[in-house]
């Protein structure tokens, strides 16, 4: 496979793989128990350039292309899916909106620090009553005396505790429907930006997920991101890259579970021979490997289109849909191959299963992906 990638892509993949193998994988189980990703790990991601993967080098980033991003995301997710969640959200929907719609001043103010990991980004779109129905927002932003004043609540905000800057979507014109939503850059130390208690989750526990409340949170007028009324456009335009990132994350989780299952099947002896010599287990492993490789092809195809600046709404959704559902199947089979031991935390495949499940939900549920794909047919 190496011959299919450029030297830069291989270099980025190998750096991410080394970090995942040496730092993430040995500690992921403990971070899962602690429900906390150490700040030092985030700083190391920044030093490696993994937090500025879509930011051009002239703006302080390490952008090569989206295939390199997908390769790095797969490796980080194989080491620790929770770390990959933080990295994906920060890159795709943290840096992405500023890169695509920010003014030169906004880009200069935020992107270099974000790419270096000095400032982490969050994306505040989902609300308690508005998940897949993203346009049904209740958070309001009113222009008063040269400042935008935000009031409302957001739900399931990844990096909610860690972020220094949040991309916030709020209604600025209640009578304009979908065209009445705008996007804002809100520093998280702004008075009235209130971070709630982190959610207790099934998986990706080391990634902080918090509710956020805006209580007369006032920001300068120039913190409007893009044009007034462009909020939904900004949100949706960055979901393509976000879905490629999550698809690559699902791919990495599946690969980690598969590697453990393959190794265990070679070591565990039943009925006088290793599990891997039993036809039933061989067939499971063959199906798992095939599904993983098929998902990788879909992910990299979407990544190539994104790199070329070509439309990839359907392709990104196909990659995310297939990879996320594949990951749950592969992780389930990995548990089955381990038998009763697979149900124990000591063997870690149960954590991969828990982590995989969210990839069918965030950045658009599987049901939404099918709707998107069907509309493009």
Identify the residue ranges that each predicted region occupies:
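Alpha-helical interface subdomain recognition
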Residues: 1-89, 101-106, 113, 117-118, ...
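Short glycine/proline-enriched turns and hinge-like loops at secondary-structure junctions
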Residues: 64, 133-135, 159-164, 177-180, ...
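Helix-loop "lid/cap" segments that line or gate small-molecule binding pockets
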Residues: 92-100
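A short, Trp-centered hydrophobic/proline-enriched beta-strand micro-motif
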Residues: 117-125
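A short core secondary-structure module
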Residues: 147, 151-195
């Amino acid at each position: 496979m190496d011959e299919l990638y450029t030297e830069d892509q291989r270099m980025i993949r190998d750096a991410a793989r080394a970090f995942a193998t040496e730092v993430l994988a040995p500690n992921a189980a403990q971070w899962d128990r602690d429900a906390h990703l150490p700040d030092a790990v985030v700083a190391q991601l920044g030093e490696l350039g993994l937090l500025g993967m879509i930011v051009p080098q002239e703006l302080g980033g390490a952008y090569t292309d989206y295939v390199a991003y997908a390769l790095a995301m797969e490796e980080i997710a194989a080491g620790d899916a929770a770390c990959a969640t933080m990295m994906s959200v920060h890159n795709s929907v943290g840096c992405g909106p500023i890169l695509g719609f920010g003014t030169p001043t906004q880009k200069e103010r935020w992107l270099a620090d974000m790419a270096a990991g000095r400032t982490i980004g969050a994306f505040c779109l989902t609300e308690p009553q508005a998940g897949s129905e993203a346009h049904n927002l209740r958070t309001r932003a009113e222009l008063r005396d040269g400042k935008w004043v935000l009031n409302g609540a957001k739900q399931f905000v990844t990096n909610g505790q860690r972020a220094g800057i949040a991309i916030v979507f709020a209604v600025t014109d209640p009578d304009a429907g979908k065209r009445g939503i705008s996007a804002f850059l809100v520093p998280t130390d702004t008075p009235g930006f209130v971070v709630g208690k982190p959610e207790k989750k099934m998986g990706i526990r080391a990634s902080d997920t918090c509710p956020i409340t805006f209580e007369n949170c006032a920001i300068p007028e120039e913190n409007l991101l893009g044009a007034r009324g462009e909020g939904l456009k900004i949100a949706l335009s960055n979901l393509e890259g976000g879905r490629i990132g999550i698809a690559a994350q699902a791919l990495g989780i599946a690969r980690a579970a598969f590697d453990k299952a393959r190794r265990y099947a070679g070591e565990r002896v039943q009925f006088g021979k290793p599990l891997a010599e039993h036809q039933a287990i061989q067939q499971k492993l063959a199906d798992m490997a095939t599904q993983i490789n098929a998902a990788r092809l879909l992910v990299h195809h979407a990544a190539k289109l994104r790199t070329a600046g070509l439309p990839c709404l359907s392709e990104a959704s196909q990659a995310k849909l297939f990879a996320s559902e594949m990951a749950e199947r592969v992780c389930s089979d990995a548990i089955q191959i381990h038998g009763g031991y697979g149900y124990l935390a000591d063997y870690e495949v149960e954590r991969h299963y828990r982590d995989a499940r969210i990839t069918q939900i965030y950045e658009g549920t599987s049901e939404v992906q099918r709707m998107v794909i069907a509309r493009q047919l």
